[in-house]
Amino acid sequence: MPTKIAVLGAGSWGTVLANLLTENGHEVDLWSHNPDQVALMKRTHQNEHYLGAEFTLQPALHVTADLGQALDQAAVILFVVPTNAIRSVAEQVKPILQAHKGRGEQPIIVHAAKGLERGSELRISQVLAEVLPKELIQGIVVISGPSHAEDVATHDITTLTAASDDLKLAEKVQKLFMNDYFRLYTNTDVIGVEIGAALKNVIAIGAGALHGLGYGDNTKAALMTRGLAEISRVGVKLGAEPLTFIGLSGVGDLIVTCTSVHSRNWRAGNALGQGEKLPDVLKNMGMVVEGVSTTKVAHQMARELDVDMPITDAIYQVLYENAPIRTVITDLMKRSGKPEFDFDNASLQKP
């Protein structure tokens, strides 16, 4: 039975997910806030700016700049916009859902964002829950894991996690996406999935910088492993399940983001390692680099939670204090010795 789905955000990931859901037989509206982009996509049946000329939109996929049209009778609303746009888009969605109230079952809200809101330090599901009251929606599901849009576009095998406080909702979303190249597992640890998704972008900037500086595999492996320790520490302090961080949304997403040229965060770090300045890097990228803003949020969270995050702090110094990368690397290596696993540290224990 086809499901009516609204995908909000026509960047690379939103477009690919909308295409996949259409392939799976669902009725999908892909919304963009940019009418010119919509007109071009309708004319060319492509999203060349984000995905190149080889990627073709499914004929049945409907692209629109009319948010009300996209949301009309939608059983599922999938947010695939940058973290800094989540709240504003949700605020546009809210009055439309209020007008639709009583016309049928409330929609399931799904998001695929990988970041934290600046200022509030909220996870994305928290932002959505703050804007969209319970009486307007069934609940919230997050999908996350090791995934680049470019690979999914060519039907490379990909596995993600669908996480929700309500397992039945996660299972419903799981069924929508599953096919012979795209597989979802379910999880109820929303905190862990969202923290892993957001903070791995910070570590990926560091991994890219190491590559740009010419460091080898040993160094990169050390950064990723100790970076995962930092992500786990802050996640567990916030109430996440430790096992989540060795799953798809933890170590899985960390690996793909820290090793792939498709990763915007890795590419940004690589450019910094080669000597480019951050404003120039962001301008040349032409797309959102979530890890830059997330670094600032994570730096503040570490202090508020009293969690040791030396790698995150080092990346913060490079991005926001113009510290030389080689200097912060030396400072990291000169820290006093400590055990690899500090199980007596309160930040490693679930509250």
Curated annotation (Swiss-Prot):
InterPro entries this protein is in? 6-PGluconate_DH-like_C_sf, 6PGD_dom2, G3P_DH_NAD-dep, G3P_DH_NAD-dep_C, G3P_DH_NAD-dep_N, NAD(P)-bd_dom_sf
Which cellular component, as a GO term, is one annotated location?
A: cytosol
Q: Name one GO molecular function term.
A: glycerol-3-phosphate dehydrogenase [NAD(P)+] activity
Q: Which Pfam families does this UniProt record tie to the protein? A: NAD_Gly3P_dh_C, NAD_Gly3P_dh_N
Q: Name one GO biological process term.
A: glycerophospholipid metabolic process
**Top enzyme class of this protein?**
oxidoreductase
Q: What is its EC number?
A: 1.1.1.94
What's this protein's function? Catalyzes the reduction of the glycolytic intermediate dihydroxyacetone phosphate (DHAP) to sn-glycerol 3-phosphate (G3P), the key precursor for phospholipid synthesis.
Protein known as:
Glycerol-3-phosphate dehydrogenase [NAD(P)+]
Which species is listed as the source? Answer: Lacticaseibacillus casei (strain BL23)
